[in-house]
From Swiss-Prot:
This is Ribonuclease HII. Residues 19-206 form the RNase H type-2 domain. It catalyses: Endonucleolytic cleavage to 5'-phosphomonoester. The keyword Zinc does not apply. It is an enzyme of class 3 (hydrolase). The gene is rnhB.
Length: 206
């Protein structure tokens, strides 16, 4: 019987025959409210950025410190999104794929290959490669993760100013106990994803 190996992923080796790689990642598949946000980043190999790591493992302070450096040093970066209405129409998986397509299409320089965090690649006009735990293994994906996370968090903070009773700045729209209590008390706004089960239940749809 084989010895169970630790879940350590090997260092990523960039495929040969390609020059420009875009890293792509998403933030916000799980929340009940707001857009699913994706980012695409092409880094400059001659201008490396120290301290890139998966955005979820970095402190907010570190993410905010890295953001301007990524934007300044990257050859190109872009944000793509899908709205709650689009998520309800398409489903969250398809909406995430569309948001990734939009992020890549928005790059001022088009890559030879898109490196996508996860296990699915959207339909693209260039080569694409899905990389499990890519946000930990590939600098371009880490940079995309940081941009997407900061953008979405800031949008939740803005939404919190409009609707402070929901506590968006704290839970960022994710399904927490405090969030459910706020929905039970105040209902939902147009920013909610009405196809998500907890929201359907509150609205009496399901």
């Amino acid at each position: 019987m084989a010895v169970k190996e630790k879940k350590e992923f090997p260092p990523f080796e960039y495929p040969q025959g390609y020059q420009l790689f875009a890293g792509v990642d998403e933030v916000g598949r799980g929340p009940l409210v707001g857009d699913v946000v994706t980012a695409a980043v092409i880094l400059d190999p001659n201008n490396p950025i120290e301290g890139l790591n998966d955005s979820k493992k970095l402190s907010e302070k570190k993410r905010l410190a890295l953001l301007p450096e990524i934007k300044e040093k990257a050859l190109a970066w872009s944000v793509g999104r899908c709205s709650p209405q689009e998520i309800d129409e398409l489903n969250i998986l398809q909406a995430t794929m569309v948001a990734m397509q939009r992020a890549i299409a928005g790059l001022s320089v088009q890559p030879d290959m898109a490196l996508i965090d996860g296990n699915r690649v959207p339909e693209l006009p260039m080569a694409g490669l899905a990389i499990v735990k890519g946000d930990l293994r590939v600098a371009e994906i880490s940079a995309a993760s940081i941009i997407a996370k900061v953008v979405r968090d800031q949008e939740m903070e803005e939404l919190d100013k409009l609707h402070p009773e929901f506590g968006f700045a704290k839970h960022k729209g994710y399904p927490t106990k405090a969030h459910f209590e706020a929905i039970e008390k105040h209902g939902v706004t147009e920013h909610y994803r009405k196809s998500f089960k907890p929201v359907k239940r509150i609205l009496g749809i399901d």
